[in-house]
Structures are given as structure tokens and as C-alpha cells.
């Protein structure tokens, strides 16, 4: 069942069209200068695609959107440091966000288990 779910998400990621042609060196330079409109173009170009990527890791669409939004917030706060091309950076940032989310789930489960044992 898990294999089928992964295969479906992989297909969805391929089918989702993102307009990467809009994201060029000039756009990244404008973001680095703090231009909000340029950042909005980047966000709108990648949001759906990155949500699908994140969801393929964690299988939770709400959390996937949160991870993508947190990633974009970090990008905005670190503007001035972005370089072109940005696609690989975005994918890696989403992967790291998903791994951090999964680690936090594991930690929470472990704490709950320890608490239950202490109560017994």
C-alpha cells in the first residue's frame, strides 16, 4: 500500500506544472534586493510543486503546506543571500523541513511513551 501511495505522489509531482521559466537570475537578484513582488512570483511559481514534494515525504497535506510556508519565510528573512539557480536549493530545503518534522514526530511519540510508562 505504501508503495502505491509513493508511486501516486511521484506521478503527481511530475504532472504538476510549475513555471520555472519565470524564475531567472534577474528575479533572484530582485528578491535579494527585497522586492516583495519578485518574491511573490517565486512563491506562486513553486508553491504547489513544493507542497506535492513535501507531501510525498510526510503524507500530511496540511503539514506539507506549513513546511513549504516556513521554507519561504526563511528564504524571505535570508534575502540577500540567494543565488541562481534556486530549484535545487528549494528542493533540499523542503527535504530538510520534512526530515525535521518526522524527527519531531518521533521525539513526541517517545516522550509520550515515557510519560505513559512513568504513570504505570
Pin down the residues of each PLM region.
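Alpha-helical structural segments
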Residues: 41-45, 70, 118
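Sigma70-family region 2
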Residues: 32-33, 70-86, 105-106
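Short, charged helix-capping/linker segments at alpha-helix termini
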Residues: 32-40, 51-68
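N-terminal module of bacterial RNA polymerase sigma factors
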Residues: 1-48
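Arg/Lys-rich amphipathic alpha helix in sigma70-family domain 2
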Residues: 81, 95-113
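Hydrophobic/aromatic residues within well-ordered alpha-helical segments
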Residues: 42-46, 50, 86, 94
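Hydrophobic-face residues of short alpha-helical interaction/recognition segments
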Residues: 50, 54, 90, 94-102
